[in-house]
C-alpha cells in the first residue's frame, strides 16, 4: 500500500527525504534544526546534507565515527514521524515495501533541553534519562503488549491514585552506562505532549490540573526520582523498545521549575553538553 509508507519521487522517505545509503546506524537527535550545525561543526568531513521543513539531516565523520545528526522538531508527533521513517530506512525494502528478513538496530542519542522539577538539580547541569514516562499516553495508539508495564502501573495506581494507563519506558542499559558519569544527574524524565498546560504552566488560560508539578515531582520509582519535564524522550524510548533500537536521552537543564530559575547562558550549556556527548560517542 503506497499510502502507508510514502516515498518521494527520488525514492527517499517522505518527511526526512533520506535514502538508506544516507543514514548511519549511529544517530544524534536534536529538536532545533539550527542545533544540527552546532554539532556537525566538530565533524572532520560532511558526506551528505538535506533539509525538509524542520527535519534537517547531516551525515559525516567525527573521530572516524560515521554519525547522522537529525533535527526532529518539537513534540511527540514529530518523534513518531522520525522514528518510523528511520526504522523504515534500515528495516524495510523500500522497493517492495516488505520487512527485511534481517532487522538492524539503530543507536539513537538525543541531545535536548529540559526543565528540572527537583530543587537539587541545578540550572546548567546535565541529566541523563534512565527511564521516561509518557504522561499523556501518546503511544497508546500502538500495540504495547510487548512492554512490561505491570510493575509501574501498580506503583502509580497505589502510590499516586492514578488509574489511567500510563507507561514508563526504559533507556538502553548499554547506552546509559556509556554516557553516564559523575558529571551528570540521572532519573525519570516526564514527557508531556505540550510546553504550557501539560507542563503545569498558566499564562492567560487557567490550567485544569491542580498542583500538577507537585504530583509529578513526588514520583519515585525503581530507586529513581522524577527529575525533569520535556516533550520527546518517552516516545523515543517507547518506540525504540517496540522496534528493537537502542536509545538514550541527555538533557541540558536550562530551567528549574521548583526554584523558578532559568539559565543565564543557555547556548553555552548546550555547547557543553554537545562536547560531553561527542567525547563519549
Describe every region a protein language model picked out.
Residues 1-167:
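Metabolite-binding pocket within alpha/beta catalytic cores that recognizes anionic/polar moieties
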Residues 115, 132, 190-197, 235, ...:
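Glycine-rich beta-alpha junction loops
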Residues 152-221:
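Active-site rim beta-loop-alpha module in soluble metabolic enzymes
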Residues 167-171, 228-233:
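Polyanion-binding loop/helix "lid" in catalytic or ligand-binding cores
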Residues 223-227:
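Short pre-catalytic strand/loop immediately N-terminal to key active-site residues, enriched for Gly-Thr
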Residues 243-258:
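Glycine-rich phosphate/pyrophosphate-binding loops
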Residues 256-281:
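His/Asp/Glu-rich mid-to-C-terminal helical/loop segments that flank catalytic regions of hydrolases
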